[in-house]
Amino acid sequence: MTALNTYRRWLARVEDDALRAELSALDEVRDAAQIEDRFYRDLAFGTGGLRGVLGAGTNRMNVYVVRRATQGLAAYLKAAGLPLRCAIAYDSRIGSARFARETARVLAANGVTAYLYPRLEPTPALSWAVRYYGCGAGVCVTASHNPAAYNGYKVYGPDGCQITLETADAVSKHIGAADHFDGVRLCGFADALADGTICMIGEDCLEAFLDAVERRSVWDGDRSALRVVYTPLNGTGRECVTKILRRIGVTDVTLVPEQAWPDGSFPTCPYPNPEERAALEHGLALARETRADLLLGTDPDCDRMGAAVPDGGDYRLLTGNEMGVLLLDYLCRRRSENGTMPARPVAVTTIVSTDMADAVAAHYGVELRRTLTGFKFIGEQIGELERAGEAERYLFGFEESYGYLSGPHVRDKDAVNAALLCCEMAAWYRAQGMTLAQAMDALYEKFGYYRNELQSVVLPGEDGMERMSAILTALRAAPPHTLAGERVTRVRDYLGGLDSLPASDVLELRTAHVKVIVRPSGTEPKLKLYYSAHARTMAEAAALCAAARRDMSARLGE
């Protein structure tokens, strides 16, 4: 069916008033390009579930697309013989609460018991609920840190991890077999509540989650003097983060007022990503005013955390790699000192995260495992340890994109856990007369200076994906002989699978002091290049990264 015919069918069948008005406003001639974009395909379902712009159309996030995806998920659970139970959470985004309720209605109509949080909650609380109720799956309605125009639908497996590629393919096939209008079962929300096929998640589940997070503490010293500014970026983090901080005695917490309450329009930060300085500008201003020891920011679904700390009269943003290394060192040091370090401890990070983690782990005798990008792979490593009866060996996991987890209580990155650890670590260093900036600099002095940079090369146009594939093919066929003036001594191609990792379209180049990893984004025509350099000073490391970037840009024709 053509995009135009699909548009006409939707115009005739859609009952939702807002979506119908949106479709009715389109003119088949004047808006032909927009109709094509809305209806030329179904919104893609992958390991991250669904994610797209809100609006009417098969290539948009709306109630009909969500219902159809849920019909496919219910069919998959039955076909796979998994428990017919599914936990549901949602964030502060436009439409999230409704999408969550519609997900519950479709599941219940298909004989799958839906456990629905009664209010917005962080994504890690969804991972927890999946495990708490023994569910076959979980759904979190969120688009993470995308702009306000987006929403999404993340699917989790029975282990509390985001689903694998194989599972995503299987669910996608079931989704494809369901018609948006005639192929979806739906029941009344109130009726399903009455008969128990929709269950509202109680406070016992959330309190148990917070108990599990609190048990990740490794220092019981006084934290009351720590001054914290916190912004949930108008997302889900406020309740859980402030509760967990109060539990451990961090009471001097000032919320950024413009960003304290849930608001899916994100009026003060169009791109609510705590990795970006722009999203934290309001928090930085308040931190300067209150002379805070620490600024924390969590993204709308509260699975990523950014931080800024006093340094030289202003505030310094810590990168995801720096926070990961600081927390790894802190956990190793404290657990070694208090006698809780497990035998044969394991830390996990990704192939694109800093090599400094290897140096820190080796210093403490910790096995460091590396996975492909995506926290689900870190969660899978925890699962492997758990199946071997060795879950206690897991110490910490992080990825350079601001995701952290210090326990096996959930299987996704957890900014509630990260906020607890970061505040505790800051208080511990404060008691020794040090800031986190000074602590990071001390680690650089001890282990050497590591510089990490990310370059994204956008390849627009219909042939963008093909051009990206051609670039990687050419790099594999003839990799550069030198980078940053150093000889390339190692080329690792993950396409055939390396180090027991699944096959992945990733190429790694190494010299004596430089590492470059090249991979496609997977969801858009964008090539990602991760640069890492190790040197005696940060200036030298930065120069090496810059030189490697120039070399690769020249190779790519940038």
Residue ranges and their predicted role:
Residues 5-103, 193, 198-226, 236:
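An N-terminal, well-structured beta->alpha segment
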Residues 10, 14, 18, 34-43, ...:
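Gly/Ser/Thr-enriched, mixed-charge loops and adjacent short helices
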Residues 39-59, 143-144, 232-244, 300, ...:
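Conserved phosphate/anionic-ligand binding catalytic regions in large, soluble enzymes, centered on
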Residues 87-150, 247-307:
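N-terminal small/polar loop signature for handling phosphorylated ligands or for N-terminal nucleophile
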Residues 97-102, 127-131, 149-155, 176, ...:
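Short acidic, glycine/serine/threonine-rich loops at helix termini
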Residues 288, 292-294, 314, 334-519, ...:
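Phosphate-binding and adjacent anionic-ligand microenvironments
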